[in-house]
């Protein structure tokens, strides 16, 4: 994993996760984010398990999740927030 400053600092993935989560807390989207995050992790684990089983004939556990899935969840939550804001602004007319 990439390190931000020194071996004692959190990984880049952890820092990005923390910053994204802080931003979502400000927007009140935390529950939606975690539901999406869990769904993406489940999908990734299933795909990895199928790919590993296909290649080696046995399943293998991995404890990490690619940073791309984090951004996918964030993008989904941001789109949901934009959609909610649009609905609220239209209902005020």
From Swiss-Prot:
It comes from the Eukaryota. One of its GO terms (biological process) is nodulation. Keywords: Nodulation. It comes from Glycine max. The lineage of its organism: Eukaryota, Viridiplantae, Streptophyta, Embryophyta, Tracheophyta. This is Early nodulin-36B.
